[in-house]
Amino acid sequence: MAENGTDCEQRRVGMPKEQNNGSFQDPSFMCNRKRRDREERQSIVLWRKPLITLQYFILEVLINLKEWSVRLWHRRMMVVSVLLLLAVLSVAYYIEGEHQQCVQYIEKKCLWCAYWVGLGILSSVGLGTGLHTFLLYLGPHIASVTIAAYECNSVNFPEPPYPDEIICPDEEGTEGAISLWTIISKVRLEACMWGAGTAIGELPPYFMARAARLSGVETDDEEYAEFEEMLEHAQTAQDFATRAKLTVQNLVQKVGFLGILACASIPNPLFDLAGITCGHFLVPFWTFFGATLIGKAIIKMHIQKLFVIITFSKHIVEQMVSLIGVIPSIGPSLQKPFQEYLEAQRKKLHHKGDSGTPQSENWLSWAFEKLVIIMVFYFILSIINSMAQSYAKRVQQKKLSVEKTK
């Protein structure tokens, strides 16, 4: 991305040609103007300008609500059809009858799938920061199921309380009855739904780049601007990061479906570039989304599941805890809380809800809970900052349009 006057001089593609104002004919002037505007927007955050940030956030929310209301009004027939369908489903939901057992099962599965799809979307979209929901939610869930499966020698956990709470069934399995495939099958639905959510979250960069290419209008999106600059200076790229991005871009552009599938299947931080590349070169939607969905929801998720399940299998966990105790000086003191945590988890798995035994909280679980709260809180702050900066961008664009007409 251009950050100084020299780079601004090099970027002359797509600059506006205004005949009535000489300053707008100069590409370096426009590039410097965009850089200043971007720096001004980036300064609009809650910890620097709280009042302005909150004001802009509220105004952006109102504008978005208005825009969505207009869109829904233009599609009012579809909205009415959806409302009628929801009304019929609501009647079926509340009427007593033999169908209620089926209704409750469908409701439970739909809510469970929607929960993990939503977390996957949050992890992928992120609105500037990203909420790492695999580390915070799906990973710990798979780890808990793995530990419980080896402790109970079964995955037939009572429902309820599963999945809200895991306890061993009354009839536990035989020793060695648990296999890797058994645990994979137990967590397959939530893992695939989370992967599908991450695939859906990759669509915004694709649609943004596709719209910019079709309209021919220069976008102020920073990632897309960086992508365009990378294409302009592809022959002179020297640093490793740029060469890696160019490799991804060439793979996606030349190989197509299989290239997108490979990028989506392997955990890497450059997949956003694949979405921008596909949008920029007008790759068909189903080619991009189909490859992304298969890669993220099936291939990549099985890789991540295998890693977590193997890492938290019984013998691996015991070996890791014993290795912690080998650390000189601080080993025993570090090992003790991990041993206490594992012992508490084992007791909890055999704890029945009506026994009334109080459960003491381990400092590891306490620290993890606080970490989750902090990350969710920071994610909410990032949403507020991002929407406030979006409104600031609207103000700057309006101001620029007024200046051009003078």
UniProtKB/Swiss-Prot annotation:
Cite the ranges annotated as topological domain Cytoplasmic: 1-42, 98-110, 272-273, 328-363
What reaction is this protein's catalytic activity? a 1,2-diacyl-sn-glycero-3-phospho-L-serine(in) = a 1,2-diacyl-sn-glycero-3-phospho-L-serine(out); cholesterol(in) = cholesterol(out); a 1,2-diacyl-sn-glycero-3-phosphocholine(in) = a 1,2-diacyl-sn-glycero-3-phosphocholine(out); a 1,2-diacyl-sn-glycero-3-phosphoethanolamine(in) = a 1,2-diacyl-sn-glycero-3-phosphoethanolamine(out)
Q: Where is this region: VTT domain?
A: 173-316
The record's GO CC annotations read: endoplasmic reticulum; endoplasmic reticulum membrane; endoplasmic reticulum-Golgi intermediate compartment membrane; plasma membrane; vacuolar membrane
Question: Which subcellular locations apply to this protein?
Answer: Endoplasmic reticulum-Golgi intermediate compartment membrane; Cell membrane; Vacuole membrane; Endoplasmic reticulum membrane
Membrane topology, as annotated, equals: Multi-pass membrane protein
A GO molecular function assigned to this protein is: phospholipid scramblase activity
Question: Which segments carry the region annotation Disordered?
Answer: 1-22
Q: What is known of its domains?
A: The VTT domain was previously called the SNARE-assoc domain. As there is no evidence that this domain associates with SNARE proteins, it was renamed as VMP1, TMEM41, and TVP38 (VTT) domain.
The protein's job, in short, is: Phospholipid scramblase involved in lipid homeostasis and membrane dynamics processes. Has phospholipid scramblase activity toward cholesterol and phosphatidylserine, as well as phosphatidylethanolamine and phosphatidylcholine. Required for autophagosome formation: participates in early stages of autophagosome biogenesis at the endoplasmic reticulum (ER) membrane by reequilibrating the leaflets of the ER as lipids are extracted by atg2 (atg2a or atg2b) to mediate autophagosome assembly.
Q: What is this protein called?
A: Vacuole membrane protein 1
Give the source species.
Xenopus laevis
